[in-house]
């Protein structure tokens, strides 16, 4: 894992890179590199906003690309132990020596704020993640002698909003009420 962080006048940048080697994937497909970059700006400091109404305001963005490998023993066909002593069963899944790592590319944009002496806070973010080269089991014709094979197929996208808010209607030396 290699990373670097930089902060210049209320602007933050974080860059990382990581490479993994997986023993569950074949040589040539077993190494995957995943980088990420994120940045944020504290607008309330940058714009010198120092009022009782606005205490803190930050915008942020990030992008990452990560890999995923498969379960062990998916690359080669092997016999399974039988329920009978000393026996073996034929495999029910056809192995795939050419499996590649899954890939997930994601990004997020967000805003965080605190207002009225931090009595009202919020955090809103939009995220988007796309997974490609999913490692999935697909059915095959039974005449092949197996039921399934493991392949890289499919693409799925997951996106949405994350919202959190807190209000503190009562705060004094004896009581603090958060909602």
Language-model features: locations:
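Extracellular/periplasmic, surface-exposed regions of secreted and cell-surface proteins
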Residues: 4-5, 9-179
């Amino acid at each position: 894992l290699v990373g670097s962080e930089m902060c210049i006048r209320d602007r933050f940048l974080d860059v990382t890179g990581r490479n993994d080697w997986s023993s569950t994937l074949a040589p040539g497909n077993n190494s995957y590199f995943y980088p990420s970059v994120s940045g944020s700006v504290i607008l309330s400091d940058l714009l010198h906003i120092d009022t009782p109404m606005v205490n803190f305001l930050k915008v942020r963005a990030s992008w990452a690309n990560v890999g995923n490998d498969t379960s062990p023993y998916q690359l080669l066909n092997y016999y399974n132990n039988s329920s009978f002593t000393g026996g073996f069963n034929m495999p029910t899944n056809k192995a795939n020596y050419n499996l590649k790592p899954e890939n997930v590319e994601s990004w997020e944009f967000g805003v965080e704020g605190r207002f009225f002496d931090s009595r009202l806070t919020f955090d809103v973010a939009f995220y988007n993640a796309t997974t490609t080269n999913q490692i999935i089991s697909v059915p095959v014709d039974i005449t092949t002698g197996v039921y399934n094979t493991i392949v890289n197929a499919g693409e799925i996208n997951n996106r949405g909003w994350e919202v959190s808010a807190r209000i503190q209607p009562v705060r004094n030396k004896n009581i603090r009420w958060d909602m």
